[in-house]
């Protein structure tokens, strides 16, 4: 029977636990070991990995794929480590043994740390404690990586525009048309930026329509020749009803980019893409949808501070209000931010339906609900008695 010697503590600690790393940066830390009794240690090893994984079931078939960004292995040594026979470290209770490590992330594109429904991109350091006649003990610590996306390139600073027209019919009888044209000042944005929307809407059909806009994320997973797409509605804004025979315009209508992860475009098995959808809800017919692609960048360097001022002229928000940190902040997990009722599979159209079931684009005009004025403030003190006492 093998008796297992108890280890008091065995953990990986990074020198900067809150840091978000980029390509080419050094990851440094130490492995800390404490024992409850005299213990012989053969070796302390580390394995650092960065892997993208996708996995889902397609009927009875398992679709699975991995892509590796980082792999680093090393055997660690103590500074002035005491050694016994066979070059083993003799650890004693009451002492803390620290093994330092450090390695550099690869240059070039790296997948941003991400966790989705059918896949993830994870980075971690795993430490192994090898002892004679004992099972190898393991401990693991994750760290965050962001692939820096520069939104100040000419391609991402260029305006994006589109237009679309849809003929509407009722019982196969033509009923006019609905047209939409829209433009945004640039394609690349960062968290906290305001997207300034310029759009024109025309309604010549007999129905009342409603213009809206939404930022939508698309997660694309690829494995074994199969593709899985998950669509998420992140934020939205709407305009006023457009009655028959009238037009409407948006001149700098703002939609803020919330706290979301940067776009992941360089991974061959997992992509995170964003779009600004400008659409018109037409009762009894399909929506008229414009899809303007977006690229969400990481917050670093100049970010989009100077190049997105044109899209901020219609907003009252200042850069002081954004409270930008000096170092990039770890992006949140999508599954923690997005409400469950907005996590829908493709296609996009059901995603754009309102969740509250309200009649915001009725065929007939509805009168607003009548509401009584609220009652006056109640008090148990009689003002007449107070006046008599004063006199």
Swiss-Prot record:
It is found in: Cytoplasm; Nucleus. GO terms for cellular component: cytoplasm; cytosol. The keyword Oxidoreductase does not apply. There is a cross-link at residue 212 (Glycyl lysine isopeptide (Lys-Gly) (interchain with G-Cter in ubiquitin)). The keyword Iron-sulfur does not apply. Its main location: cytoplasm. This is Thioredoxin-interacting protein. It comes from Homo sapiens (Human).
């Amino acid at each position: 029977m093998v008796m297992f010697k108890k280890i008091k503590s065995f953990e990986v600690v990074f020198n900067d636990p809150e840091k978000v790393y980029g390509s080419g940066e050094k990851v440094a830390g130490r492995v800390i070991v404490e024992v409850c009794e005299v213990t012989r240690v053969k070796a302390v090893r580390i394995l650092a990995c960065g892997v993208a994984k996708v996995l889902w079931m397609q009927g009875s078939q398992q679709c699975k794929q991995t892509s590796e960004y980082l792999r680093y292995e090393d055997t660690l040594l103590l500074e002035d480590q005491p050694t016994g026979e066979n070059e083993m470290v003799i650890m004693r209770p009451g002492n803390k043994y620290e093994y330092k490590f450090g390695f550099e992330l690869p240059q070039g594109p790296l997948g941003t740390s991400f966790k989705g429904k059918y896949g993830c991109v994870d980075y971690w350091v795993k430490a192994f404690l090898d002892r004679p006649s004992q099972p190898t003990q393991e401990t693991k610590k994750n760290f965050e990586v962001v692939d820096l996306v520069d939104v100040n390139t000419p391609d991402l600073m260029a305006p994006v525009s589109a237009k679309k027209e849809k003929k509407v019919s009722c019982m196969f009888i033509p009923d006019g048309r609905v047209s939409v044209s829209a433009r945004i000042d640039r394609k690349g944005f960062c968290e906290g930026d305001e997207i300034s929307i310029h759009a024109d809407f025309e309604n010549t059909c007999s129905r009342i329509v409603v213009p809206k806009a939404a930022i939508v994320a698309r997660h694309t997973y690829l494995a074994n020749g199969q593709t899985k797409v998950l669509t998420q509605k992140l934020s939205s804004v709407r305009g006023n009803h457009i009655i028959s025979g009238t037009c409407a315009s948006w001149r700098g209508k703002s939609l803020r980019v919330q706290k979301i992860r940067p776009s992941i475009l360089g991974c061959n098995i997992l992509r995170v893409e964003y779009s600004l959808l400008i659409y018109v809800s037409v009762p009894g017919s399909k929506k008229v949808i414009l899809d303007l692609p977006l690229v969400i960048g990481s917050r670093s360097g100049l970010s989009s501070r100077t190049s997105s001022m044109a899209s901020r002229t219609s907003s009252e928000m200042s850069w002081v209000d954004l409270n930008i940190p000096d170092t990039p902040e770890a992006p949140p997990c999508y599954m923690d931010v997005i409400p469950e009722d907005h996590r829908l599979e493709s296609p996009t159209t059901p995603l754009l339906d309102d969740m509250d079931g309200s009649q915001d684009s009725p065929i007939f005009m509805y009168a607003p609900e009548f509401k009584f004025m609220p009652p006056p403030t109640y008090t148990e003190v009689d003002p007449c008695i107070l006046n008599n006492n004063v006199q």
